[in-house]
Amino acid sequence: MGRVTAPAPLEIEKTESAEEVFAVPEPDVPWVTIVHNDPVNLMSYVTYVFQTYFGYSKDKATKLMLDVHHKGRAVVSSGTREEMERDVQAMHGYGLWATLQQDRK
């Protein structure tokens, strides 16, 4: 039988670690609820929802609604992930488009 040779092992350059590829939630960073603009809900209704659910004054609710309308989105609350999940579900219940994310400024 002849001599069998194996190719030399390749050196693989380390690129990104799993932490760099996947954003890992940081426990000290608060979460926020973001309401996005939609073509369905009236501005007066969005203001009403912010006043009713969050207890915001008419002025604050109107400012947030105008941010949603003109900027396309507004941060309407912040806190723990569980609290923000509850707020997002409530906004969905009112028919608003809302998401949550960590506030990584």
From Swiss-Prot:
InterPro entries linked to this entry = ClpS, ClpS_core, Ribosomal_bL12_C/ClpS-like
A single BP term in Gene Ontology: protein catabolic process
Please state which protein family the record places this protein in: Belongs to the ClpS family.
Q: How does it assemble?
A: Binds to the N-terminal domain of the chaperone ClpA.
Function, please?
Answer: Involved in the modulation of the specificity of the ClpAP-mediated ATP-dependent protein degradation.
Write the protein's name. Answer: ATP-dependent Clp protease adapter protein ClpS
Corresponding gene?
Answer: clpS
